[in-house]
Regions:
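Gly/Ser-rich catalytic serine loop of serine hydrolases
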Residues: 113-122, 221, 279-291
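Structural recognition of the beta-strand scaffold that forms the well-ordered cores
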Residues: 83-87, 140-145, 176, 181-186, ...
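C-terminal subdomain of the subtilisin-like protease fold in secreted/lumenal serine endopeptidases
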Residues: 184, 302-415
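Protease zymogen maturation seam
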Residues: 2-7, 19-25, 31-81
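Solvent-exposed loop/turn segments at secondary-structure junctions
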Residues: 89-93, 109-111, 133, 147-151, ...
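Extracellular S/T/G-rich loop segment that most often corresponds to the catalytic His/Ser-adjacent loop
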Residues: 228-300, 304
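Subtilisin-like serine protease catalytic core
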Residues: 73-84, 89-104, 112-161, 233-234, ...
Length: 416
């Protein structure tokens, strides 16, 4: 059985088994990359290319009926008035699936992309805002391109200040500056200990403080606590993948302590720019924007709810009985119908993913210091709203900050 119909609050989604893994029914493509490189969460695994040409149009997807999106559209839930961001590969806005979609490339520098990353980025954008089968045909989508493994960043992506304009941390900040309410990230880092990536910790601290929802995939390595997944970070909604029958996608989806929810991971049809065909692909890259889009539908329905209440709504309407958590699907698969039909004002204004684990980053202290203006001033370089309020006078004339520092004015100094 699928998720709840949009016309009712009854939860009919099945519970999910405790085992899940990989990509598209065959060997998953690992997300291991070079230390500073990014990878595609979906693993770009192509399954059984369909005998079609790239100039054919994809008109529907299996998830459209599974999530009862026809009912959502009939009731006017189309993402109208919501701004969502994706950090990914480039989007081919000339693709017929994206005709009429409201998409703007907000990248701050030139990214040298390839067909693989264009296939991925265009697929994610189509899932979000395609007029044919997107969750949010009337939403505003901002795209931010990043440089993937094997690609050389352009010179204009490397400013003198040292933080790349096509990096994840800067892209999160740009998305928030531009007014995005929800950010979907279907990429992964290299298999490294990234706890001390200060710019990323600062960007997520900002998102937590300003109520911006960040959704990211668990990865496609069929492993526990995939080291390449950004879902291990505090402040992120970690998404694993399920199949259409509700079972955990154990042949590819990663899992672990940081999973929050799950969604259909494929296969979906994609426009493959390498082969010139329409192909099928699966991965947590697909599940991630489904969760982000579902939250966007909830944002449209409940404009007065805080982002924390929407996150509480997500975990309280998951498919697991009595909101029980497990390390496969978190609190259970996302249920867009229940998100639309359940009033989030009944839930506390508390972020349920801000502190996933005691040893996860950014720490509660980092989040608090950023909100208090005590984070080192360079960490606010791409934050148009950041005011340094600490006591280090070397930042009094910091030209890299948009806002003038106000030394010694942090509320932390007056807090008992």
């Amino acid at each position: 059985m699928g998720p709840t119909p949009v016309v009712t609050t009854h939860k009919s989604a099945p519970r999910h088994p405790r085992m899940f893994a990989g990509v598209a029914g065959r060997a998953a493509r690992a997300l291991t990359t070079a230390a500073s490189a990014l990878a595609l969460c979906v693993g770009a695994l192509v399954v059984a290319p369909a005998p079609a040409h790239a100039d054919d149009t994809i008109t529907t997807q299996d998830y459209f009926s599974y999530y009862k999106l026809d009912q959502a559209r009939a009731k006017g839930y189309t993402g109208k008035g919501v701004t969502i961001a994706m950090i990914d590969g480039p989007v081919d806005t000339s693709a017929p699936e994206l005709a009429g979609a409201n998409i703007t490339d907000k990248s701050r520098c030139t990214v040298n992309s390839d067909n693989k990353s264009k296939t991925h980025g265009t697929a994610i954008a189509s899932l979000l805002v395609s007029k044919n089968y997107g969750f949010l045909p009337d939403a505003t989508l901002y795209s931010y391109q990043t440089t993937f493994e094997g690609q050389a960043p352009s010179e204009d992506c490397n400013p003198d200040i040292g933080t790349r304009l096509d990096g994840l941390a800067s892209s999160i900040n740009f998305a928030i500056n531009d007014g995005a309410q929800i950010i979907s990230i279907s990429i992964a880092a290299g298999q490294i200990d990234a706890k001390f990536e200060a710019p990323l910790n600062a960007a997520l601290s900002r998102a937590i403080n300003q109520g911006i929802i960040v959704v990211t995939g668990m990865g496609n390595t069929s492993t526990d606590n995939d080291g390449g997944s950004y879902a291990s970070r505090n402040g992120t909604v970690g998404v694993s993948a399920i199949n259409l029958d509700g079972s955990f996608a154990s042949d590819y989806s990663s899992y672990g302590d940081s999973v929050t929810t799950a969604a259909f991971g494929g296969p979906i049809k994609v426009r493959d720019y390498d082969t010139g065909q329409i192909s099928d692909t699966s991965g947590t890259s697909i599940a991630t924007p489904i969760v982000a889009a579902s939250l966007a539908l909830a944002r449209q329905k409940w404009p007065d709810a805080t982002s924390n209440q929407l996150l509480q709504l997500l975990i309280h309407t998951g498919s697991n009985s009595q909101q029980a958590w497990n390390n496969r699907t978190g609190y259970g698969a996302v249920n867009p119908g229940a998100l639309i039909n359940t009033d989030p004002s009944q839930y506390p204004d508390e972020n349920p993913v801000s502190q996933k684990a005691d040893d996860a980053y950014p720490t509660a202290e980092m989040v608090r210091d950023y909100g208090d203006g005590r984070a080192d001033a360079p960490l606010g370089t791409f934050d148009d709203t950041y005011v340094y309020r600490g006591t280090d006078d070397i930042y009094i004339h910091a030209e890299f900050l948009t806002q003038t520092p106000h030394l010694g004015t942090s509320p932390a100094y007056h807090r008992k």
